[in-house]
Amino acid sequence: MLQNHKLPKSISAKELNELIKSAKKIQIVDVREYFEWEICHIEGALNIPMNLIVESIDKITKEITTVVMCHHGVRSMNVIHYLESIGCKNLINLEGGIHAWATDVDKSMSTY
């Protein structure tokens, strides 16, 4: 049986780059594994692997907009559904994840 989940709000890599440049207070949570983070990451992002979200929930600032990201945008969408289920708001999924960032914003970034 399929659960009735609405798709989370999403943002493109280029839109996220503009948001970062605007100096609006946001938080970026990267839910990829540590070894993926070591390959490449967005400067200033917080790395909390998906399997550690529950025990690391206190590291997420709930009062500001949080962009959740992963490699391509699937894990981050699942994390957003969990965070919404426990009452978190102002969550945005990075469409295409770090791959989109490397392709559309920072072409010098390593990819995998």
Task: List each language-model region with its residue ranges.
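Rhodanese-like catalytic fold shared by cysteine-dependent sulfurtransferases
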Residues: 1-27, 34-65, 74-112
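Short, surface-exposed ligand- or partner-binding patches at beta-edge/loop junctions that are enriched
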Residues: 69
